[in-house]
Amino acid sequence: MGETKIIYHLDGQETPYLVKLPLPAERVTLADFKGVLQRPSYKFFFKSMDDDFGVVKEEISDDNAKLPCFNGRVVSWLVSAEGSHPEPAPFCADNPSELPPSMERTGGIGDSRPPSFHPHASGGSQENLDNDTETDSLVSAQRERPRRRDGPEHAARLNGTTKGERRREPGGYDSSSTLMSSELETTSFFDSDEDDSTSRFSSSTEQSSASRLMRRHKRRRRKQKVSRIERSSSFSSITDSTMSLNIITVTLNMEKYNFLGISIVGQSNERGDGGIYIGSIMKGGAVAADGRIEPGDMLLQVNEINFENMSNDDAVRVLREIVHKPGPITLTVAKCWDPSPRGCFTLPRSEPIRPIDPAAWVSHTAAMTGTFPAYGMSPSLSTITSTSSSITSSIPDTERLDDFHLSIHSDMAAIVKAMASPESGLEVRDRMWLKITIPNAFIGSDVVDWLYHNVEGFTDRREARKYASNLLKAGFIRHTVNKITFSEQCYYIFGDLCGNMANLSLHDHDGSSGASDQDTLAPLPHPGAAPWPMAFPYQYPPPPHPYNPHPGFPELGYSYGGGSASSQHSEGSRSSGSNRSGSDRRKEKDPKAGDSKSGGSGSESDHTTRSSLRGPRERAPSERSGPAASEHSHRSHHSLTSSLRSHHTHPSYGPPGVPPLYGPPMLMMTPPPAAMGPPGAPPGRDLASVPPELTASRQSFRMAMGNPSEFFVDVM
C-alpha cells in the first residue's frame, strides 16, 4: 500500500509541516487531507503546473478533488479563512488565477512593518492588492464600503472613539489614509470586542479591512499567548516611528576611521525575521563619530542594497561584505523612539527633547548637541544624575561651561580648571587597572574629545590630541605610572598643578561632612569608601590657654594637613604611642622655646592623637618620605594644636582678620572642627596661603605622589 507525503505551510510560518497519508498519491483527495488536519477555517492552496504560467499555487475547495502531486509528494499552503466573521471573502472573486503571495518570505520582515514602508501603499490596483500584504488594508478598505456595518454591536469604542466614527469622514466617504494615521499614531490601544492578544497594528487594520490576510495577523497573535505583550509592544514602536516617516540617511567616510563601530541585533519570530536593528555603538568608530545613529534604530538599507525582503543572515552577510570594501558607506535607518525598548537594547534613558537612552546620549549625542551631564558627584547624587538631571541640569551646566569661552589661546590652567569642574562633562571616576583602583581617573580619548568639542580653534581632532599631550608634558594631567607620552587608551589623573584649581570650584562644599564629593589632590583615595577616624577621640576640649602663640596663622584644613596627619599615624605606629619618651615631645617644642607651657599641652594632645589614629590606614604615602618629612610633620601638628587652642580664646572661631573655615554651628561640636574632616576633604583656601613653617607638609604630599603605583597598592 502506497504512502503520500504532504508538506504544508501554515500561514506565514517559515518552517513547513509534514503529514503522511496511507494512500497512493494518485488517490489522495482534499477530504483526506482535511481529515488529517481538522482545520476547517483554512483555505487550501496546492502547488500545481499551469500551461501558461508554469508553477502556481492553486486553490482547491472541492473535497473530492484529487490533489496535485510533484515527485511523489504534495506541497500545500494553508491560509486563514474568515470563518468566524459574517463578511464574505473579497479574494479570488475577480480572477481566480491571481493567488496570494508565497508565505515563505512574506511573513518575514515585511509583516512587521506598517504600510508607510512600502512605495505602493497608496496604490489601488488589483495587482497591489493580491501581491502585497501591507497594501491589502488600504485597498480593501475602499472595496468593502457597501458591506460595512455600523450597528451598535460593531461600535466598540477605541480610545474614546467608536469604530463607526472612525470609518467615515463627515462627507460619508471612506478615507483609508485618515484611518491609518489617526489610529496608528495614537498610543497603544486594544479593540474591546476582540481577543486581548490583538495588538494595535492588527486592531486598526482589522476594522479597515475585511481581507483574509489581515485576519491572519490577528489569528497569528492569538497563538502566541506567552510572548504576546512583548512582541506587540515591539511592533507598535516600529509602527509609531515609521508612521512619523523619520527615516534618515547617513553617509560615513571610512577613510578617517578604522571600523564602522556598530553591533546589530536581528529580530525573529514565528513568522520569520523581523528586521535588523542597531544593538550598540562602540566609541571610536565611524557611527559614533557621526552621532546621528542610535541604539534601537532599524537598519533599512546599506549603500544601494535594501534589507526589506532579506533574511537576517543575508543582511549580516551583505553588511560584512560592504564594510570590507573601500570607500564611503551610506546607512539608511528608521529612528525608533520607543520609550520602552526590548531587553536586547540598552536601558531606557531620557534627553531634553525626546526620549532616548542617556548612556548613548553621553557617548555620542552629547558631542553633537553640546549638552553635558554632571559627573564626579557623590554616590547619593549619581542616581539622580542618571535619571532626571539630564533634563533639569543640562542647560545650566552648559551655560556655566560656556562662561569660560575657552580657545586655544586661553591660559592652559584655565582650560584645565574648566575640565576639572564637576559640570564639565569629562567622565572622572574611580577606575580599575590591573586590580588596582585608580581614584578620579579619566581616559585619554575622553580628554581629546572634550578639548575638541569645548575649546575653540582646533581644526581637527589631531590638534586636540597634541594639546592633550602638551597638558601631560606641562604636568596638568598625569599618567598613573608617570609615563610622559600621551595615549588615548591610558588612564590619567589631574596633576599637582591643577589640583588647587579644581578645588577652587568646590569652595561651596562643606569639608566637615563625613564624605567629600571630590578628592583634594589626585590621586588621593575617594574618602567616601570608608569612614575615617576622628583625629581627636577624647570627649573633652583641650585645656584653654591665655594666649595664642601663632595669632597670624590661618586655620588648618586637612587638604594640606592630611599628609602630616598621616605622618603622625606612621610615627605613632613605629614608636607604639603609649611608650613615647618625653624627649620626643621635647624635640617638638624645642624650636619654640618660649612657650614651654603650651608645648606641654600640645605634646599631650599630640600624644593622644598618635595613640588613637593607628588603624588600617596607618601606612600613608608620607611614610616613605623619610625622617625629614616626619620631623616637619611634628611642627605641622604643633601649629595645628596651637591653632586649635585658639578656638577657646577667640569667640570668632579663628585668628584675627581671617574668616572661619566652617560655620559656628559646626564648631559647637566637642571635637575641634578642623579635625572633623577626612584627609580627602577639600581645602578652604589655596596651598599658596600655607605659612612657610608648613611647606614641608606640601613637600611630603608631592614626594608621596612621586610613586603613585605603590600608593594605590597601599590603599587597597
UniProtKB/Swiss-Prot annotation:
Question: Got a GO cellular component term for this one?
Answer: Wnt signalosome
Pfam families per UniProt? DEP, Dishevelled, DIX, Dsh_C, PDZ
Biological process (GO), any one: Wnt signaling pathway, planar cell polarity pathway
Phosphoserine, modified sites: 48, 125, 192, 697, 700
Disulfide linkages recorded for this protein, renumbered to the chain, are: none
Which part of the chain is the DIX domain? Answer: 1-82
Show the ranges annotated as biased composition (Pro residues). 653-663, 670-682
In which tissues does this protein get expressed? Ubiquitous.
Q: GO: which molecular function terms? A: protein-macromolecule adaptor activity
Extract the ranges annotated as region (Disordered).
Answer: 85-235, 546-691
- Compartments it resides in: Cytoplasm
- In the record, Dimethylated arginine modifications are located at 698
As stated in the Swiss-Prot or TrEMBL entry, residues carrying the post-translational modification Phosphothreonine are: 346
Basic and acidic residues compositional bias, start-end: 142-156, 582-595, 604-622
Write down which residues bear the modification named Omega-N-methylarginine. 27, 212, 342, 698
Oligomer status and interactors: Interacts (via the PDZ domain) with the C-terminal regions of VANGL1 and VANGL2. Interacts (via the region containing both the PDZ and DEP domains) with LRRFIP2; the DIX domain may inhibit this interaction. Interacts with CYLD. Interacts with CEP164 and DAB2. Interacts with DCDC2. Interacts with FOXK1 and FOXK2. Interacts with DAAM2.
Q: What does this protein do?
A: Involved in the signal transduction pathway mediated by multiple Wnt genes.
Q: What is this protein called?
A: Segment polarity protein dishevelled homolog DVL-3
